[in-house]
Curated annotation (Swiss-Prot):
Sorted UniProt keywords: Aminopeptidase, Hydrolase, Protease, Serine protease, Signal
Native species: Pseudoxanthomonas mexicana
One annotated GO biological process: proteolysis involved in protein catabolic process
Span of the signal peptide: 1-26
Family: Belongs to the peptidase S9C family.
Known regulation of activity: Strongly inhibited by the serine protease inhibitor diisopropyl fluorophosphate (DFP), chymostatin, leupeptin, 0.5 mM ZnCl(2), 10 mM o-phenanthlorine and N-tosyl-L-phenyl-alanyl chloromethyl ketone (TPCK), but not by N-tosyl-L-lysyl chloromethyl ketone (TLCK). Activity is not affected significantly by iodoacetate (IAA), L-trans-epoxysuccinyl-leucylamido(4-guanido)butane (E64), pepstatin A and phenylmethanesulfonyl fluoride (PMSF). Activity is stimulated by addition of 0.5 mM CaCl(2), 10 mM EDTA and N-ethylmaleimide (NEM).
Record note on temperature dependence: Optimum temperature is between 35 and 40 degrees Celsius for the hydrolysis of Gly-Phe-pNA. Stable at a temperature below 20 degrees Celsius for 30 minutes.
MF GO annotations: aminopeptidase activity; dipeptidyl-peptidase activity; endopeptidase activity; serine-type endopeptidase activity
Gene3D superfamilies tied to this protein: alpha/beta hydrolase (3.40.50.1820), TolB, C-terminal domain (2.120.10.30)
pH dependence, record text: Optimum pH is 8.5 to 9.0 for the hydrolysis of Gly-Phe-pNA.
Name the record gives this protein: Dipeptidyl aminopeptidase BIII
Active site per UniProt: 506 (charge relay system), 593 (charge relay system), 625 (charge relay system)
């Protein structure tokens, strides 16, 4: 497997010699190769978006979006016919607001906010007339879950709250004006989730079983829950009830039982008759578009190489065909008014960030509203290429390759010459990489690196067989898939064996640690962002409200409650092999991470120090599972950029002022990254929760 890498390296050296016959010269560095391409500032890529999450209120009265107020993201509204008359309606001064939605109550919107990344999200209602915000879940250590909104009851909302029992959410009907809550369901039955009809009657529920499967329950005539359906463990990530139409007559159900990829079915509530809505042999069904007045599904997305919308209701076929034909990139429908006359749509291409439009259905007109990141317009962004890579046991790994301009002059997705590569590993791991604009992909390509994002086994979206193939394979075949993808890139001439870094967050951080401990010669360096180092301590410290998911974790990873499981998890933990690390490692961690606790990073750093192995450890005291504050994200990426430049030879924008406003601290290894120690000397830490 190493011979192709050797030949590619030799070829590059030979070409360099042939072009300069009088004196042997080293092959140009990644920075030299891309020197003629404009360097895109980190602030343009990772600073606050100018406008994002654009929506329209159900009554069509307002446009809304998130944008910065004094550098902090807040919710803004404007008259739908006059976006220039915008005003901020929230006043967050710390982490910012990213998740919000409209209620059906006129002049009322809702948003979610946690503290310092602790993921104890509270739900707030904002009265647009008075500007007052009310915490609808004013209880400590409570994580709100929105369980239902209904146009039939615009003044109330269903909310799950775990203030009584941290593990399980009780269901309340909450009055938006007063904040008063009425208990609808005390969750003594360990229910993982509920489905309510438009009158807020709880009709269906799902409960996890000790075998890792789940029971779907239905409310019986006597008011008690009774078993409605059975989901085996192997189907539980790809099978679940979705929701009811507004008349309560149809239940939508995503189902992989008796098949590989998940299909969408419609179930007649009265008769139990199941009707296939959509299936695809390549990939699981994804998101849906539903009629806002009836809840009837009208289109279903399927994402194999790229996301495609499949129309199942002719009423919107012409609309989607028109929108897809206009471009640029792939279209998504953000929100629709209740009368369905107006849609807010967004277009995204790999080489262009989101652009938002207003679509008037009756006139058939599309009006541009905003670009999420106008600073990137005209910048040298590059395409992304979907590829299918065969693993060593012949599984198909849908992956995405991004090439720097210096390596793909004719823009055909084929490397002209090998360049350093960053293997960018997604988190989850029960998630997936998809085609589209990615700030990290563009940033790394602009610095001179190829970027490869791989859907390794265990990823979701490609059928249950592919997902279940990852069971018990942390640091096993899941990691083999990443190694196989790198070998593919070497054989394709994208890179050479000695020029590959591994980087990722969450599971991607674990994959980075695995790469440097289980295969210590495979990568030139690694960047671990909030990755677990010890699978036993990871599983013993998950949030209490993950109780309904824990049996799945135990079956897919290893059971820390048994001796055999503990042994297995120890064997698959990078901490166990920390003494094998021989390549440079950068670690980033949020101190308030509720999923991957700070101890996960602390303990591997301590183990490396005990063996005198260098490491650079960056810690943010006001972050959780990832870096939400743009100041912190930019700060960490500034460190990462210098780290990768030292390791792979790409170019690096100086740290400059990118620590300003951040809470960055570097407990260990500040001298391991060029310019880091000096930048810290003049930095004043700003902690905002």
């Amino acid at each position: 497997m190493r011979h192709p890498a050797f030949r590619l390296t030799l070829l590059a050296s030979t070409v360099a010699f042939a072009l300069a016959p009088q004196a042997a010269q080293a092959a140009p560095s990644a920075a030299d190769r891309i020197a003629g391409t404009e360097l895109i500032a980190r602030d343009a890529l990772f600073g606050n978006p100018e406008r994002a999450n654009v929506q329209i209120s159900p009554d069509g009265k307002y446009l809304s979006w998130v944008a910065a107020v004094d550098g902090v993201l807040n919710v803004w509204i404007a008259p739908a016919d006059n976006p220039s008359q915008a005003r901020a309606v929230t006043q967050d001064t710390a982490r910012g607001i990213r998740s919000y939605f409209w209620s059906y109550q006129p002049d009322t919107l809702l948003y979610l906010r946690d503290s310092g990344g602790d993921e104890d999200f509270h739900l707030y209602a904002v009265d647009l007339k008075t500007g007052q915000a009310k915490d609808l879940t004013p209880f400590p250590k409570t994580t709100a879950q929105v369980a239902g909104v209904s146009p039939k009851h615009p003044g109330t909302i269903l909310v799950g709250m775990n203030d009584r029992d941290a593990q399980w959410h009780d269901i309340y009907k909450v009055d938006l004006a007063s904040g008063n809550r009425t208990l609808l369901e005390k969750n003594d039955a360990q229910i993982a989730g509920y489905i309510a009809d438009a009158d807020y009657t709880l009709k269906y529920a799902q409960r996890s079983r000790p075998d890792g499967g789940a029971d779907v329950l239905r409310r019986g005539a006597n008011g008690a829950w009774e078993k409605f359906d059975d989901i085996p463990f192997e189907d539980v990530l790809t099978t679940s009830p979705g929701g009811l139409t507004l008349d309560g007559k149809t239940l939508y159900f995503t189902d992989s039982r008796g098949r590989n990829t998940a299909a969408l079915f419609a179930i007649d509530v009265a008769s139990g008759k199941r009707t296939l809505v959509l299936e695809d042999a390549r990939a699981d069904v994804g998101g849906t578009l539903a009629d806002p007045a009836t809840g009837k599904v009208q289109a279903v997305s399927v994402d194999y190489l790229r996301d495609e919308w499949k129309v199942v209701d002719p009423a919107i076929r012409a609309d989607l065909e028109k929108l897809e034909a206009i471009g640029p990139g792939d279209v998504s429908v953000n929100t629709r008014t209740l009368d369905d006359k107006t849609w807010i749509v967004a277009y995204s291409a790999a080489e262009a960030p989101l652009v938002y439009y207003r679509y008037d259905r009756s006139a058939g007109t599309l009006t541009k509203l905003f670009s999420a990141r106008p600073k990137l317009e005209g910048k040298p962004l590059v395409p992304q290429w979907p590829v299918e890579i065969a693993s060593r046991d012949n599984k198909t790994l849908v992956s995405y390759l991004t090439l720097p301009r210096s390596a793909d002059a004719n823009n055909d997705g084929k490397a002209d010459a090998p360049v350093p590569l960053v293997l960018l590993v997604h988190g989850g791991p029960w998630a997936r990489d998809s085609y589209g604009y990615g700030g990290y992909n563009q940033w790394l390509a602009n610095r001179g690196y190829a970027v490869l994002s791989v859907n390794f086994r265990g990823s979701t979206g490609f059928g249950k067989d592919f997902t279940n193939a990852g069971n018990g394979e942390w640091a096993g075949k899941m990691h083999d898939d990443l190694i196989d993808a790198v070998q593919w890139a070497v054989k394709q001439g994208v890179t050479t064996q000695d020029q590959v870094a591994i980087m990722g967050g969450s599971y991607g951080g674990y994959a980075t640690l695995t790469g440097l401990t289980f295969t210590p010669d495979a990568f030139a360096c690694g960047v671990d962002i909030v990755g677990p180092s010890n699978l036993n301590t990871l599983l013993s410290t998950v949030p209490p409200y993950w109780a309904s998911f824990f049996e799945q974790l135990a079956k897919r990873m290893g059971d820390p409650r048994t001796d055999a499981g503990k042994k297995w998890l120890t064997e698959r933990s990078p901490l166990t092999r920390a003494d094998q690390i021989k390549k440079p490692l950068l670690i980033g961690q949020g101190a308030n991470d509720p999923r991957v606790k700070q101890a996960e990073s602390d303990q591997i750093v301590k183990a490396m120090q005990a063996k005198n192995i260098p490491v650079t450890y960056v810690l943010f005291p006001d972050e959780g599972h990832g870096f939400a504050r743009p100041e912190n994200n930019k700060a960490f990426n500034a460190v990462t950029e210098g780290f990768l430049a030292q390791c792979l030879g790409g170019r690096a924008e100086p740290i400059g002022k990118d620590f300003t406003g951040s809470s960055i601290s570097v407990p260990v290894g500040a001298d391991g990254v060029p310019g880091l120690a000096e930048a810290l000397k003049g930095h004043t830490q700003e902690v905002k929760k």
